[in-house]
Amino acid sequence: MNRGELYRVYKGSKHDPKKYRIFVVVSRQVFINSEYSSVICAPIYSNYNGISTQVPVGVQEGLKYDSCIRCDELISIPKSMLTDYIGHLSEEKLEELNKALRIALAAEYYFEY
């Protein structure tokens, strides 16, 4: 498992009406490789509003439809639920994801990059 990989998760949340949702792993690689049983993920939705905390994704990443990663809705998911691999983000998309995560967490105000 690597940062930036997309996985289909069946019934990821009891509040989600969909049968499954696709998530992208956003935890840092050292945490993913650790003994911890969960990783931080961001959900992917089909509707894109163009806000700064959303990253557009689509067929290039292994999806059927144009969609977006929502960095304002991070959740912890057990690694054992991340088994249905869909695809991965390009280096360019990972940079967009990093920027959207910094905005979502207000991290650009606290850290110099």
Label each PLM-derived region with a short phrase.
Residues 61-113:
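C-terminal terminal-subdomain/extension
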Residues 16-20, 25-59:
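Compact nucleic-acid interaction/catalytic patches
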